[in-house]
Amino acid sequence: MKIPHRTTSSLTLLTVLALITSIAAACSAAEHSPGSTSATTTRPASPFDPTEKPPSPIGLLLAYRAIDEIGLVDGTNVVASVSGTFGSSNDLITTEDGKFVFARTTDNKIATLDVESGKGATREVPVGPTLGTGGAGTIMWLEQPNRLMQLDLADPDSQPVLHQTVDLPPAAGGHLREPRLVAARGGTAVIARVEAPPSPFGGPDTLYAVRGPAAPTPLGQADANSPVSVARLSPDGAELTYALYRSTDSSCGTAAVVLSGADGTQQTFEVAGPDADRGSRVPKLWWPVTGPPKLSLVTWRCDRPETSSPLVWQLAGETSDTIEEVSPPTSALQTIDVAPGQRALILPETGGYAEPTGTLVLEESTRRISIKSGVDAIAAIRPSP
């Protein structure tokens, strides 16, 4: 099923970047049968030190974050890992140069894994609640009240340095809340702040794009009464996609997906179905180095706690002007194409969406091989030439 979009005029991220440039020069597991849906537009850890060097990569590697470790997979084998306790999020887990896997521990430290050596460590560096990337082997976070901080993972002795001070414009009404980093990638950081009278559900957010020394540029107010927490920038930082969740009460709400595109418009895809008694949510968004952004979508009946299996969708078309289920229809929290005929998937532990973690499996034809349980995020790493 393809869904057209609702188009409205807005200042898009690409337009913002152009403006700023001018100013500042991812054993067998059971298969799940995908359901159907309809949509309409608009862990401190001891450092991991292997006794011998991991096998040389034979192809694309998979990085993963689980509740108890971050790791690397070659084929179906975990070849390196770092123990820790990790919460689920939509944060990136690999640096832009593909040389490090990283994640924030629940006690606010940073676990890292060197892809080439297989060595890992836990850095005694307090980081912010949301991590992004800042180019090459650096990571980035927001330190209150207005400091974008950066850490170079390639230097084991590095300390956080100030990347940029972000002075958001004043807002009327006295309802300001602390800003939050929503995403950072490709030289762009997106920051959210509640500026209007907040709803009981925490929103709405006003979004800003930050790139270079120029002043942040507003991207507008999110059309939702809940905070924006699931978002992803394109690899070059030129486009942004994020999920909306419009709460109707504590147990229900509906989802939409927004893309700030390259054509001067903002596209909103209303992925909620027409049934007012059904809720929907986007728990995960990812944007591969190549290809369109993808997302997992879950639905449920508002009068029942059970949810359906998450289904994978993607933005499609030459200008990402439609949204559709991937082919073949896939029930998973996240997917990555590994090789022709092979995919890595995070499958829910149960048939429905009960928690944001699942089992990482490698799928080849009709066979699925389990690799690791309790996984909530994966990313592809291509070996350096």
Placement of each model-derived feature along the sequence:
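Loop/turn-rich, solvent-exposed surfaces of beta-rich toroidal or solenoidal domains
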Residues: 278-317, 326-348
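C-terminal motif of bacterial Sec signal peptides marking the signal peptidase cleavage site
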Residues: 23-26
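An edge-strand/N-cap motif at the start of beta-rich repeat modules
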Residues: 39-83
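Repeated scaffold domains used in trafficking and secretory/extracellular systems
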Residues: 47-52, 86-98, 125-138, 169-185, ...
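Short beta-strand elements that form the blades of beta-propeller/WD-repeat-like
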Residues: 52-66, 91-94, 98-105, 135-144, ...
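Bacterial N-terminal signal peptides that target proteins for export
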Residues: 2-14
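Bacterial signal peptide processing site
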Residues: 28-31
